[in-house]
Swiss-Prot record:
A Pfam match: Globin
Name of the protein in its database record: Hemoglobin subunit gamma
Organism: Elephas maximus
Top-level taxon of origin: Eukaryota
InterPro entries (UniProt xref): Globin, Globin-like_sf, Globin/Proto, Hemoglobin_b, Hemoglobin_oxygen_transport
A GO MF label: peroxidase activity
Length: 147
């Protein structure tokens, strides 16, 4: 179980309140697919993923990115129970989709990069540390069913 201090919770929730879920989610998933192209195999129904511009402009990537980032919103609301919050998604990704759990860590790291890019100086080292802790906790919660 991940323990967040009051300061970490405040840093996470304060920034989350400013996140454009649709824009940031689409960018994070798009970057994941560009930077780690082997992750594209899980999205074979998404159409054209042949280039970075095709991926970043793909409406299905954007829509699924929004869905993924919305689930991070559930994490923000349930920082003290990440494992429980992601139990069903862990089961889905393990049993049905067979996603390599390492991809959860990669997506979390990409999300931190996207947030840093969007928020600039506001994304201080302390804010980054809190978010990195959260995305690691989410990745571990999503990987739980695999163990």
């Amino acid at each position: 179980m991940v323990h967040f201090t009051a300061e970490e919770k405040a840093a996470i929730t304060s920034l989350w309140g400013q996140v454009n879920v649709e824009e940031t989610g689409g960018e994070a998933l798009g970057r994941l697919l560009v930077v780690y192209p082997w992750t594209q195999r899980f999205f074979d129904t998404f159409g054209n993923l042949s280039s970075a511009s095709a991926i970043m402009g793909n409406p299905r990537v954007k829509a699924h990115g929004k869905k993924v980032l919305t689930s991070f919103g559930d994490a923000v609301k349930n920082l003290d129970n990440l494992k429980g919050t992601f139990a069903k998604l862990s089961e889905l990704h393990c049993d049905k989709l067979h996603v390599d759990p390492e991809n959860f860590r990669l997506l979390g790291n990409v999300l931190v990069i996207v947030l840093a890019n969007h928020f600039g100086k506001e994304f201080t080292p302390q804010v980054q540390a809190a978010w990195q802790k959260m995305v690691t906790g989410v990745a571990n919660a999503l990987a739980y069913k695999y163990h």
